């Protein structure tokens, strides 16, 4: 089970990289999708969690972006998200937030 989860965590970003972008906007969503692939390990595919972890797909982009910034700064309490958020820039937060907000 752990190996299949690890495989999915690496396979999805690689597949997303292989997708051609139809326009600049689509390219940004693809990059946002690639960046948000690590979210799927806890939040489920496309941000739809099957368990107790919050669903993040379809949330307002500004809400997601602010939450990520607050996790990174420590303003918002977390067990795991603070550590994950430290690895991303504000630009990457915006791409992730826009991608997840588009997953309605």
Which stretches of residues belong to each language-model region?
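Bacterial N-terminal signal peptides that target proteins for export
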Residues: 2-11
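Soluble non-cytosolic domains of exported or imported proteins
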Residues: 30, 58, 87-91
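Electrostatic cytochrome c docking/interface patches
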Residues: 17-36, 52-54, 65, 70, ...
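C-terminal capping alpha-helices of c-type cytochrome domains
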Residues: 73-76, 86-104
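Gly/Gly-Pro-rich "capping" loops immediately C-terminal to redox-active cysteine motifs
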Residues: 46-76, 82, 86
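Detector for the c-type heme attachment site
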Residues: 42-49, 101
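The canonical Cys-X-X-Cys-His
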Residues: 37-45, 96
């Amino acid at each position: 089970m752990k190996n299949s989860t690890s495989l999915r965590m690496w396979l999805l970003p690689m597949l997303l990289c292989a997708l051609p972008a139809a326009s600049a906007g689509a390219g940004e969503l693809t990059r946002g999708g690639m960046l948000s692939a690590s979210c799927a390990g806890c939040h489920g595919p496309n941000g739809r969690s099957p368990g107790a972890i919050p669903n993040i797909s379809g949330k307002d982009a500004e809400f997601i972006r602010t939450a990520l910034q607050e996790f990174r700064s420590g303003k918002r309490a977390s067990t795991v998200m603070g550590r994950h958020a430290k690895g991303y820039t504000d630009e990457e937060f915006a791409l992730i937030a826009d991608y997840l907000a588009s997953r309605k």
